[in-house]
Design a protein with these regions (language model features):
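N-terminal helix-turn-helix DNA-binding core of bacterial DNA-binding proteins
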Residues: 2-52, 69-70, 76, 107
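Residues within well-formed alpha-helices
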Residues: 11-12, 82, 96
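Basic, amphipathic "hinge/linker" alpha-helix immediately C-terminal to the N-terminal HTH DNA-binding motif
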Residues: 17, 69-93
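Glycine-centered, phosphate/nucleic-acid-interacting loop/turn motifs that mediate DNA/RNA or nucleotide
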Residues: 61
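Short beta-strand "wing" residues that participate in macromolecule-binding interfaces
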Residues: 65
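Amphipathic alpha-helical dimerization/coiled-coil segments
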Residues: 85-111
Length: 111
């Protein structure tokens, strides 16, 4: 078995398992978004926490920040190719939650 330092599951979990991180990825999977839009969709997240999560995801190359030369300045966040590769994980979690964690019947999606 691989050590935690070389285990790909452990390394991925270190990146995406922080509180709010997968929800930021989930929302950005729908398309680029401004900070205030993310803050509204992630009910309960503080601006500081959102800023920290976005910065950490940027440092990992999962999210990119686009600044537009406008007045007032406009900034949008989007998933990179590396971030898009995490979308199937989010979708799998959605299916799992629908099947095992809710009272509603799960939608059967062929693998």
């Amino acid at each position: 078995m691989a050590s935690n330092d070389t285990c790909p599951v452990c390394r991925t979990a270190e990146i995406v398992c922080g509180k709010w991180t997968l929800l930021v990825i989930r929302d950005l999977a729908e398309g680029s978004s401004r900070f205030c839009e993310l803050e509204r969709s992630l009910e309960g997240i503080s601006p500081r926490t959102l800023s920290l999560r976005l910065r950490a995801l940027e440092e990992e190359g999962i999210v990119e920040r686009h600044t537009f030369p406008e007045v007032p300045p406009r900034v949008e966040y989007a998933l990179t190719e590396k971030g898009e590769a995490l979308v199937p994980l989010v979708e799998d979690m959605r299916r799992y939650g629908r099947r095992w964690l809710s009272d509603e019947p799960a939608e059967v999606v062929p693998a």
